[in-house]
Amino acid sequence: MTSRGRPSVGGILAKMRRDLHHGPLVGVLATAMLLGACGGADPLSAQSQSQNPAGLLDKDRQPFPTTPAAGTGALAGPVLEALASIAPTLRQQRFPTDAVRAIGQSGDGRLLWYLYDLLRLATRDGVPVVVEAFEDLSGAEFAGEPFTAMGDRILAWDLPAPPNYRQLKRDLFLLIEPRWAPFFDDEDSAIDWRLVGWGGVFIDNRPAATAGEVCPRGCIPALDEPAVTDAAGGSWYPDDALVFGVVVNGEARAYPKNIMEVHEMVNDTLGGRRLAIPYCTLCLSAQAYFTDDVDGFAPLLRTSGLLARSNKFMYDITTFSAVDTFTGEAISGPLLDAGVTLNQTTVVTSPWGAWRAAHQDTTIIAEDGGIGRSYPPDPLRGRDEAGPIFPVGDVDPRLGVHEVVLGVLDADGTPVAFPVGSARLALEAGEAVDLGGVTLQPDSGGLRAFIDSEEIPAHEAFWFAWSQFQPQTRLWER
């Protein structure tokens, strides 16, 4: 929840309409003036001490290098000039080599965040310049692919951002996708911009996604109100292929994993309720949120093309409010003003044959999604077999990063995770699987969670994802 005001839905929409009539967005020149207003003090005059992030391990269970020193004062004049020149130079399709090197020699570790952001816009010749500046500023070299290595380190080091970082990042990221501006322009958002990166695709801002409408620039396209068939009509889908099963008010539906890997977002109606079902393929996390109980307003969710620590960054297309994919909590825009947190229901990950046998009246998304599209059996083709492809920072070493867990919140709101493989084996052996008052029961090859016989929302995810968004999680062990 948020301490910002809580207007009615009418107030939400009125604010949205006012925002749409705002004038041109502040540009790079304004950034330079804002940074200059901070003064030209030497950032090293009040610097945090270097320290070793003791106990923090990367995804290969190796320790991170010593945390670099970070300035606590205003940025120095030469650094301000360098920062102010970078976006305009990139806009001219030139790479600002001298400015990047000046940042690398600044001695202020806070600017490592900016260098990492800049890496996504660097030319082939510019990448080594950014890498060298990052190594100079951090005092630590690295070998191999720089994108995840740099990202993992700055996430683990958890350095503060430099002054006016949101605006600095805005100037870079709007060169990629100008339609992200409303996210950056909400000064009171709950977004930690340090954790936000580009996922390599553009925003899905299509007002309708029911007939295969395309994104001209390329996006991860949501699917609205997909066509469905009965279970017999789902004979096209192999029995051993996975579905994400949802039951609402006694009505069951299966969402084939291969279709969800293409769309990553389905807005649907099931059991008389409106649902949004995001699937973050990077986190292996399919979740189901009710979107019809927001004070009479129904958000329509889309994929932004951004990521937040390797998790999908979704948003409501009507109000352009960002919503935390893992928690359902609005983190920007009018929905944050209204204190909106979407309620969840359980998603069961199950083989289609087992789901169909347990839920004989189930429906399943049509083979063509209702939009005449052909879906390959395995769209990702083993993409994640070698580990996370985006930075995840420090990891909880209790499990491997890609071990699958079922995550829930207990009655006190404490996160609890159950390793799926071990939990299934225990249940098959007739053992009880419970922790913190939460008990698991099998469902068609998947799992459901209960407290005192009352079902609670649950979903599966990779361990790295669940543990980083729920760092205080309790872990069940067999």
Which residues does each predicted region cover?
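Conserved hydrophobic register position within alpha-solenoid helical repeats
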Residues: 96-102, 129-134
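Mid-to-C-terminal functional-domain signal that highlights helix-capping/loop sites
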Residues: 53-59, 73, 77-89, 112-478
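Bacterial N-terminal signal peptides that target proteins for export
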Residues: 4-26
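C-terminal motif of bacterial Sec signal peptides marking the signal peptidase cleavage site
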Residues: 35-37
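Boundary at the C-terminal end of the N-terminal hydrophobic targeting segment
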Residues: 43-48
